């Protein structure tokens, strides 16, 4: 046992070690960022805000993909082999970080957005496709500024075991913040979007090569060791 920690296993209880962390320079490809938005409207301000975020991320050096939710079936209303479901899940696995953007409707994120998250599995075989990946949150409001949608999405990010960055963006009266060409106008709200994407890139560069180590847990190492022991014992019967 570890000193005065009689309930722990010496072999499995590891002291965190900075030498186990990889340098950002050791990863030889641009950060891979997936962007999701929560509206199928032809004039979708969450989509326009997402595209502004994508432009910033590309400027910062990221490789980006935007998933367009039109045609995605409701959860459990189609098999996981549906082409849009396959597309979404493959993009989730490809990504090292994500941006989520939803309108706030009736005080909550939209069903369009939640349906996308509900198609993301917590486990895919032995892989947790979102665990340890970074996440940035944004929302658009039709009226005064609110944070209900981003707060709800923050909870979802925690359930998916993602590293949600501290900063976030909420754009009130979004219909006033974009020009006729669909570009966001200069404002403090735009500056906040810049801040959020800059922060997402920094967190992704810091963590993407280290996510497996950062989320390696004592309880899961212990469980894995016990499962291995059981398998060996069964083979010896």
UniProtKB/Swiss-Prot annotation:
Changing residue 104 to D/Q: Strongly reduced ferric reductase activity. Binds FMN cofactor. Its EC number is 1.-.-.-. PANTHER family: ARSENIC RESISTANCE PROTEIN ARSH (AFU_ORTHOLOGUE AFUA_5G15030) (PTHR43590:SF1). The keyword Flavoprotein applies. The keyword NADP applies. Has NADPH-dependent FMN reductase activity and high NADPH-dependent ferric reductase activity with highest activity for Fe(3+) as substrate. No activity with NADH, iron trichloride, Cu(2+) or Ag(+). May be involved in cytosolic ferric iron assimilation as an NADPH-dependent ferric reductase in vivo. Homotetramer. Optimum temperature is 35 degrees Celsius for the ferric reductase activity. Pfam families: FMN_red. Belongs to the ArsH family. Gene3D superfamilies: 3.40.50.360. Optimum pH is 6.5 for the ferric reductase activity. This is NADPH-dependent FMN reductase ArsH. Keywords: Flavoprotein, FMN, NADP, Nucleotide-binding, Oxidoreductase. One of its GO terms (molecular function) is ferric-chelate reductase (NADPH) activity. GO terms for biological process: protein homotetramerization. Its cofactor is FMN. FMN binds at residues 39-46, 102-107.
